Regions:
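Conserved acidic donor-binding segment of nucleotide-sugar-dependent glycosyltransferases
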Residues: 295-307, 313-319
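Donor nucleotide-sugar binding/catalytic pocket of nucleotide-sugar-dependent glycosyltransferases
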Residues: 116, 134-178
């Protein structure tokens, strides 16, 4: 009987996104999953990775780079990896955890092949901040035997930085939600972070341009801009803070419209969730968004400075059921996560040993 392959995830295990990856990988019998976290661990890891196969570095990494505290943990991580002796190191978020994994190999002789998953701003934002960050990102990408991107647009930028083998698949859903009940045509929902990169003020402005006392906007999530946004929102807008998964699913299910208008983004899991719940997406004009939304067909692509008008909404509202069915079918066909991870691991195992 063949021994399972030791596979080490390196990332932020307080992120539900890394937990989703861990669940998908742990379900594959040929892998023995180990996880090193730059912070701690969500409780969901308890059911899939035993404590003996986990390392918590207990830092507070900065997604934008400059992670001195994280780099100080490099010797500890390297010692752990030498004990684990993984065949694969899989780093999530290239400018922080990817750098850490690359340095562990380069400076401490850690064995195993490196694979990297880009999450968005590590490719779309961080390399533009400085020449040093750009050079570092390029080195990490070139050290990876395989990388993943959740959009073609981001994959193109990765290739320009030196990545040579990229798998593109959405960071999708674990399961399809049930068919939505009757939608409320007056209800709009938004749940991206209330931080500058997500441009939540654009959501408020777009909604405020629509007439009608019956219209309602529900804004979920939290962030540094919340107080400022609450002061500028009109009386039709309600802020509900961070939501658990079931409560959030309820808002998706009831809302006809979903708003996501960031200034930079790759394929958003939140937009995929909204589409799976039958919402009509209203998104900013970004290359990754255009991979999901065809303006005027299955949603709205709102250009910078463009006002949202009843005339833009009406034709889509008239076809709401057909749009919901088409969007759900696309998500089920293209954006369920487990089959994509299965194909990803098959690709890894097919690579020539170095």
């Amino acid at each position: 009987m063949t021994s399972p392959i030791r596979y080490a995830l390196i990332g932020d295990a307080e992120s539900p996104h890394l937990l989703k990856w861990a669940r998908a990988l742990a379900a594959l019998p040929e892998l023995e999953l180990w996880v090193a976290s730059s912070r701690g661990f969500l409780s969901g890891f308890d059911a899939i990775v035993p404590p003996a196969r986990r390392l918590a570095l207990a830092t507070r990494p900065d997604a934008g780079g400059g992670n001195i505290g994280l780099l100080k943990q490099l010797p500890r991580l390297a010692r752990w990896l030498h004990r684990v002796h993984p065949e694969w190191l899989h780093a999530h978020y290239l400018t922080s955890h990817g750098t850490l994994a690359w340095l562990a190999q380069r400076l401490y002789g850690v064995r195993g092949r490196l694979v990297g998953s880009a999450w968005g701003s590590d490719i779309l934002v961080a390399p533009q901040k400085s020449t040093a960050l750009r050079a570092l990102t390029r080195r990490v990408l070139r050290a990876c035997a395989l990388t993943t991107s959740d959009s073609q647009a981001m994959a193109e930028k990765m290739r320009a930085l030196g990545a040579f083998d990229i798998m593109v698949f959405p960071f999708g859903l674990e399961t399809m939600p049930p068919l939505p009940p009757a939608k409320d045509p007056a209800l709009f929902f938004a749940n991206r972070g209330l931080e500058p990169i997500y441009a939540p003020e654009r959501v408020l402005q777009a909604f405020a341009s629509l007439p009608g006392d019956e219209l309602r906007l529900v804004v979920a999530n939290d962030g540094s801009l919340r107080k400022e946004l609450q002061s500028m929102a009109d009386a039709r807008t309600t802020f509900v803070g961070r939501l658990d998964a079931d409560t959030q699913a309820g808002w998706y299910a009831r809302s006809l419209w979903y708003l996501s208008l960031p200034t930079s983004d790759s394929v958003s899991v939140s937009v995929l969730e909204a589409m799976a719940h039958g919402c009509i997406p209203i998104v900013s004009d970004l290359p990754a968004n255009r991979e999901l939304v065809r303006d005027g067909d299955n949603g709205i692509v709102l250009a910078a400075g463009e006002r949202l008008t009843p005339e833009r909404l009406a034709p889509l509202a008239a076809r709401a059921d057909a749009i919901a069915a088409a969007n759900r079918a696309w998500v089920e066909r293209e954006a369920l996560f487990a089959p994509r991870v299965r194909a990803f691991v098959d690709r890894l195992l097919a690579l020539e040993p170095r």
